[in-house]
Amino acid sequence: DGGATLFNHSMESTPYMDLDSKYTNLIFTTTFNRKFSNRFTNKTGFTYTNMFYKMDLSIAPYEAEPLEIVSQGKGNTSLISAYNSSSVGLTERWTLNAGIYGQLLTLNNKWSVEPRVGLKWQATPKTTFALAYGMYSRMEKMDVYFVKTKSTGNQSVNKDLDFTKAQHIMLSFGYKISDRMNLKIEPYIQFLHDVPVMADSSYSVLNRSDFYVEDALVNKGRGRNVGIDITFERFLEKGLYYMISGSWFDS
């Protein structure tokens, strides 16, 4: 929630903008873990999220004029997701992690199935290398689906949008400095597709900065992210624990 006020030459205040925005999520989640052997474990999970959204935005067209509603949105939907992943010790030094993730948006029955796999190599007692690949998807913010404006004829024009999708590739290097200290370096690249964009425009939800989206969008955008995360961790000893991390990111 928020608002803005203007002051005239006599320092009298008049409201310029009023925003009432509410998001509420009800979440149920459960996981089941099973260790079949020292080299084989499995994890299964399920999450149900019921989401509620309400937004009213009013703006004064001119100074000292009464506020007028320019955008409204209200609705609810559910996101259902489930996954199954396994960790298999192929040898003493090689570990395979593989799984599958799926989700369904009940608003428009859009769904996705996403495989994910990773391979880890214990090169030395202190050094590990890993390579991972996965497909990921996400729904947009609730206002994208439910906001109504005068320019759209007070209709929600984006209810049929599909998920934004991405393919992630990540490398990982881990070094055990001592029994209490660990260093991890993780470079990655992400290729995004099916990004909601405005047709015949440079607008993309990847760089949105507005309170709401008022135009029809299509899943035809692309993006690319590349970055690196570096983490130094000192484990708990004598009541002291700390972590130092840094990131570089380009989109």
What are these regions (language model features)?
Residues 24-30, 78-84, 100, 113-117, ...:
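Hydrophobic, lipid-facing positions within transmembrane beta-strands of outer-membrane proteins
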Residues 91, 189-191, 212-251:
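Gram-negative outer-membrane beta-barrel transporters
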